[in-house]
């Protein structure tokens, strides 16, 4: 058993060496609070609001409205917005250089990518101006007017597909499409029927209207004479007779 026993014998090992008397400034006092003047009666015993109570106001806190939100809420926007709400502008009046810990914290640098914080009136360090409700309504009105003028609202951004092609490229593409249209689709119908598909635009000519096929003979090539044909037949019969004699001689 220890010679010196005390309930606080290990207190010095876990005690802080500095004064823990600092804290981040808060926007609202911590709850619960023991001051009597902090509470204000708003409703009567029957549950109805008292007549002197201000009924106009935002009871859900100061958050962004519908017209201040971006078109698409992404993860990057949420991180940026959270960093702004978590007190990035608390030390606006104190220009200072960021330490290594703050440089490594990319979430803290979401609102301002600079390494040195400026003065209070520095435009790079001031709060970003959000879109007002009137500006949002004006944009919506402009969009509705444009959609009323034309059937479909056209995008102002020119895409890469609408880039003008060279005339040579247009000709080659036209030839390719014509060749594709000339081919007839394989169907169970006869060839003489009317074209129903765009690639059957060239209707085949019926057999009655087709001109008679004439085989053109070259002028330089002489025609085979009947005498030459008969001589060729006789030579073949002679060769056959000689082959039979050879086989008979081998057999003996």
UniProtKB/Swiss-Prot annotation:
GO terms (BP aspect): cilium organization
CDD domains the UniProt entry points to: Flattop
Pfam family, one: CFAP126
Highest taxon, organism lineage: Eukaryota
Family: Belongs to the Flattop family.
Any coiled-coil regions, as ranges: none
Protein name (database record): Protein Flattop homolog
Gene Ontology cellular component terms for the protein in this record: ciliary basal body
Matching PANTHER family: PROTEIN FLATTOP (PTHR34639:SF1)
Native species: Drosophila melanogaster (Fruit fly)
Compositional bias per record (Basic and acidic residues), positions renumbered to this chain: 218-252
Region (Disordered) residue spans: 177-252
InterPro entries for the chain: Fltp
């Amino acid at each position: 058993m220890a010679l010196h026993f005390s309930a606080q014998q290990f207190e010095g090992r876990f005690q802080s060496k500095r004064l823990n008397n600092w804290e981040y400034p808060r926007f609202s006092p911590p709850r619960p609070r023991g001051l009597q003047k902090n509470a204000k009666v708003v409703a009567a015993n029957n549950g109805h609001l008292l007549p002197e109570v201000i009924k106009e106001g935002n009871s859900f806190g100061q958050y962004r409205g519908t017209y201040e939100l971006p078109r698409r809420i992404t993860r990057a926007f949420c991180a940026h917005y959270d960093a702004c709400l978590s007190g990035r502008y608390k030390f606006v009046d104190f220009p200072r250089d960021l330490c290594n810990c703050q440089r490594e914290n990319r979430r803290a640098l979401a609102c301002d990518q600079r390494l040195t914080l400026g003065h209070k009136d520095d435009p790079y360090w001031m709060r970003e101006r959000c879109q007002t409700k009137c500006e949002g309504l004006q944009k919506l009105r402009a969009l509705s007017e444009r959609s009323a003028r034309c059937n479909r609202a056209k995008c102002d951004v020119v895409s890469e597909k609408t880039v003008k092609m060279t005339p040579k490229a247009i000709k080659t593409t036209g030839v390719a499409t014509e060749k594709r249209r000339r081919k007839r689709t394989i169907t169970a119908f006869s060839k003489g029927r009317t074209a129903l598909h765009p690639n059957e635009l060239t209707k085949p000519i019926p057999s009655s209207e087709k001109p008679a096929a004439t085989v053109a003979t070259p002028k330089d090539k002489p025609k085979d004479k009947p005498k030459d044909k008969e001589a060729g037949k006789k030579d073949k019969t002679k060769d056959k007779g000689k082959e039979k004699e050879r086989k008979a001689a081998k057999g003996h």
